[in-house]
Curated annotation (Swiss-Prot):
It catalyses: shikimate + NADP(+) = 3-dehydroshikimate + NADPH + H(+). Shikimate binds at S15, L16, S17, T62, N87, D102, Y212. One of its GO terms (biological process) is chorismate biosynthetic process. Coiled coil: none annotated. Pfam families: SDH_C, Shikimate_DH, Shikimate_dh_N. Keywords: Amino-acid biosynthesis, Aromatic amino acid biosynthesis, NADP, Oxidoreductase. This is Shikimate dehydrogenase (NADP(+)). The active site is at K66. The lineage of its organism: Bacteria, Pseudomonadati, Pseudomonadota, Alphaproteobacteria, Hyphomonadales. Belongs to the shikimate dehydrogenase family. Its EC number is 1.1.1.25. It comes from Hyphomonas neptunium (strain ATCC 15444).
């Protein structure tokens, strides 16, 4: 019997997840298909019921459903509780089991790129859902973390919840101090709305944007021109997919191969 898996969100047609997972499924000769399912905001209850009746056994969850997925799951992991969101579901007889791959995916990305953060100055730009996962990993790994956000109160809430030792700055103040950073992680969505970051020069620091493709182009270009080592979020996407794949099938897929496949596709379509 062919297993059915997928990603739910809105919009979701642009997702690279089917491309990643179906490549791994073919490589391991697994009888399964991974698809993208568009489910509108507020329709996750009926969406999950429909997908369950179709025989879907596992899902990745993207915007705008991560918080609602946590409320709907029969049980959720400690990581998901800590981050306040679910982005991974497995169907069991008694309902959907929820987890969150954002934090372990970011951690795996740091490992994959040999990026050491312990005791180093790290600046996190943004305080939204993705920033919560990033902050938790950076704090757990002993980074000297500064969280920068336009709304300082949100950054303070994030620090209190997940990174008690972090410093908090307004975005403008933080941007002026970035030169001292060994790593900057940008979770802001400026590139998707035509906005632009004004980065200071760097002598070899790393600028990591969790976006990829056109959404990250402007920030990465600015970073390279200012002397930063610029990295996009494609690696984090692949890492999260690998964690999901291993959960479902007990197999560690080839991340490097998938990353190369995705890079080629993104460059061809940018």
């Amino acid at each position: 019997m062919t297993h059915l898996l997928g990603v739910v969100g809105d919009p979701v047609a642009h997702s690279l997840s089917p491309f990643i997972h179906n490549g791994w499924l073919r490589a391991h000769q697994i009888d399964a298909v991974y698809s993208a399912f568009e489910v509108k905001a507020g329709e996750l209850v009926s969406g999950l019921q429909s997908l369950s009746s179709q025989g879907v056994i596992g899902l990745n969850v993207t915007l705008p459903h991560k918080e609602e997925a946590m409320r709907l799951a029969t049980s959720v992991s400690g990581t998901a509780h800590r981050l306040g969101a679910v982005n991974f579901l497995v169907r069991r007889e008694d309902g959907w089991i929820g987890d969150n791959t954002d934090a372990p995916g970011f951690g795996l990305t740091l490992d994959f790129g040999d990026i050491e953060v312990s005791g180093r100055n790290v600046f996190l730009l943004g305080a939204g859902g993705s920033a919560r996962a990033v902050a938790s990993v950076l704090a757990d790994r002993g980074a000297r973390l500064t969280i920068c956000n336009r709304t300082v109160g949100r950054a303070e809430d994030l620090a209190r919840d997940l990174a008690p030792g972090a410093r908090v700055r307004s975005l403008d103040e933080g941007l002026r101090k970035l030169s001292s950073a060994a790593l900057v992680v940008n979770t802001l969505s400026l590139g998707h709305s035509g906005g632009r970051l004004e980065l200071p020069p760097s002598a070899g620091g790393i600028f990591y944007d969790i976006s990829y493709g056109k959404g990250a182009e402007a920030a990465l270009k600015e970073a390279r021109e200012k002397g930063w080592r610029a990295l996009d979020g494609l690696g984090m996407l692949v890492a999260q997919a690998a964690i999901s794949f291993e959960h479902w099938f007990g197999i560690k897929p080839d991340m490097a191969e998938a990353h190369a496949r995705c890079r080629k596709l993104v460059e061809a379509t940018s």
